[in-house]
Amino acid sequence: MANIVNFPIIDMEKLNNYNGVERSLVLDQIKDACHNWGFFQVVNHSLSHELMDKVERMTKEHYKKFREQKFKDMVQTKGLVSAESQVNDIDWESTFYLRHRPTSNISEVPDLDDQYRKLMKEFAAQIERLSEQLLDLLCENLGLEKAYLKNAFYGANGPTFGTKVSNYPPCPKPDLIKGLRAHTDAGGIILLFQDDKVSGLQLLKDGHWVDVPPMKHSIVVNLGDQLEVITNGKYKSVMHRVIAQTDGNRMSIASFYNPGSDAVIYPAPTLVEKEEEKCRAYPKFVFEDYMNLYLKLKFQEKEPRFEAMKAMETTGPIPTA
């Protein structure tokens, strides 16, 4: 059972308090969450409850209509229902991906009706705006100029932005199969709209797995590996996983605001200068090179990935535009 602790909850509405006191307190809460958790949950954000309710309803309807039977067929074919030992090479999840930037694939994804496509485009646009707002709040806390992180993510065609739509159906053997194995996220900032009734998401904090509590109309935010690099380790990406449940079908809609594939990622010079050693603790690399490595090593510790990128850097320096 996961440790029960006070998970950080950020009230975005208080950022609009122009006397500055509440705003300063909220910025401190975000800073503490980034330093000590790598995760936080935002409420009273810019997405309407009406939009979120509609996205949840249509996503669950879509799963029942188009994906549920395919998932049942898959687990039978893979022999997961009859597994007798730990399963380490597959996850108990049904997923599809929507790409928004640099180009959208929503019109090409099969089995989406027009109303759902239109809805997910609207949802993605609002999540993208919230992602950029949060990145600017991180800049403010770090002493970076506004839009520094957004600009750092921009390649020739802007950032990479997409959404992973997942369902985690009831699992007969949650002790043997994970909903999603432990990993850190490769990219920038991740915004998750998760089920408010069925739990399962956990993060690793101080050596213990901690539940991320379901909360209606909230958005869970976590930091990816690229923010760890750009902040020179001030903020860390954190291992997290999904525990399969025997009851309930958990919905998860995770949107990833990542660097463009050709974006060059490296620690922000002003943050390096603030360090006592004035030392760059992370390498400089092209995001696509990191992703190619990550796809092979996703469910392993992140440190060897950073070391591998350091080795690549020494063999060929990357010019900075």
Curated annotation (Swiss-Prot):
| Ranges annotated as spanning the membrane | none
Q: What is catalysed by this protein?
A: 1-aminocyclopropane-1-carboxylate + L-ascorbate + O2 = ethene + L-dehydroascorbate + hydrogen cyanide + CO2 + 2 H2O
| Similarity comment: family membership | Belongs to the iron/ascorbate-dependent oxidoreductase family.
**Residue sites binding Fe cation per the record:** H183, D185, H240
Identify the PANTHER family for this entry: OXOGLUTARATE/IRON-DEPENDENT DIOXYGENASE
The protein depicted here goes by the name Probable 1-aminocyclopropane-1-carboxylate oxidase
A GO MF label? metal ion binding
Question: What sort of enzyme, by top EC class, is this?
Answer: oxidoreductase
Q: State if Chloroplast is listed as a keyword.
A: no
| EC number from the UniProt entry | 1.14.17.4
Show the Gene3D superfamilies listed in the entry: B-lactam Antibiotic, Isopenicillin N Synthase, Chain
